[in-house]
């Protein structure tokens, strides 16, 4: 794979991550900062960015997110139906499924 293709994919991932992070933060900042592994002040800073600033920020050769695989979650996903870790409107107020 060419370096320019890799750079393009990294930038695409970065902008997708920033957009998702901002949507999560706008919905529930406390839950989002925990799920994203960022501080409250970083969450607030991300919320102040407009789309143009997000695109500029994404234009780097560095990943803006860290991917962390959780063995328990992956094992649960492999063993059964889809596991939802974030509360959806349909499941609001219901307990989250246990991870064995």
UniProtKB/Swiss-Prot annotation:
Superkingdom, taxonomy of origin: Bacteria
SUPFAM superfamilies per the UniProt record, alphabetical: Flagellar transcriptional activator FlhD
InterPro entries reported for this sequence: Flagellar_FlhD, FlhD_sf
Pfam families per record: FlhD (PF05247)
GO molecular-function terms, A-Z: DNA binding
Coiled coil: none
Predominant cellular place of this UniProt entry's protein: cytoplasm
Keywords: Activator, Bacterial flagellum biogenesis, Cytoplasm, Disulfide bond, DNA-binding, Plasmid, Transcription, Transcription regulation
Gene Ontology process terms (BP): bacterial-type flagellum assembly; positive regulation of DNA-templated transcription; regulation of bacterial-type flagellum assembly
GO cellular component term, pick one: cytoplasm
Location of this chain's protein in the cell: Cytoplasm
Membrane-spanning segments: none
Record carries keyword ATP-binding: no
Domain text: The C-terminal region contains a putative helix-turn-helix (HTH) motif, suggesting that this region may bind DNA.
Subunit structure: Homodimer; disulfide-linked. Forms a heterohexamer composed of two FlhC and four FlhD subunits. Each FlhC binds a FlhD dimer, forming a heterotrimer, and a hexamer assembles by dimerization of two heterotrimers.
Stored HAMAP family: FlhD
Functional note: Functions in complex with FlhC as a master transcriptional regulator that regulates transcription of several flagellar and non-flagellar operons by binding to their promoter region. Activates expression of class 2 flagellar genes, including fliA, which is a flagellum-specific sigma factor that turns on the class 3 genes. Also regulates genes whose products function in a variety of physiological pathways.
Protein family membership: Belongs to the FlhD family.
Protein's name according to its UniProt entry: Flagellar transcriptional regulator FlhD
